[in-house]
Amino acid sequence: MSAKPASTHGTSVRPNVASRLSPTTPTLEDLIAQVKEGEVKIPAFQRPFVWKDEQALQLLDSLASNYPVGSLLLWKTSEKLRTERNIGDFTLPDTDDHSPTDYVLDGQQRLTVIYSCLGAPEDESGFAAGYDLETENFIAMSDDLPLTVFPLRALFNTSRLLDYRTALQSRPNKEDLQKRLDSLVRILSGYRLPVVTLKNLKLDEVCPIFERINSSGTRLSIYDLMVAATWSRDFDLNARTKTLAGHL
């Protein structure tokens, strides 16, 4: 008796997504540079940043321990979506409408922490963290912290990092502090975050992928995607739906 073929009822032929996946492993510094240039954007359907300070500090500790922290999923497309230019509290530059954009499908919370703690200017608002070289713990930055707390936003600022190294020379245990700083800088500078980019996929091909993504229990629906994809200066599907619902 021959086996019955698997049912395809209610499904359509799916695209060969695997052939259009592009895995890369950029350094944290390279990823931050992409964010600063506006090449990576947050779609409007994504939730706002919701992580608590402890979650952010735990991520930093995982990075410094060289632990895997999961991958980012991006969708590279020339389709214009409604985007939130802000990543956390940071307003990022616009890019021209013709350049492909990498939209964050999964990993927004992690990317926001990485940018806020390691890439943002030191005088910017938003969550900032430091590394206590005495206790070897990550802490939230605040006023009047001791010199031994290294501000992580100085990590990829060469002149600022050199100034901090020089300041450490005034400490009696400067050798130990310097070794711990060097170790931290080496690990975070060399850390590579897996990034999977979906390329050459149309809107209807991306929809099933959106449906499968689940971030902290919040599933992205086809409606969420359609709101983002159909938005323009003259049309907002979400606003139009609410208006119509109000007349029913």
Predicted regions and their residues:
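Basic- and aromatic-enriched surface patches that contact anionic nucleotides/nucleic acids
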Residues: 2-248
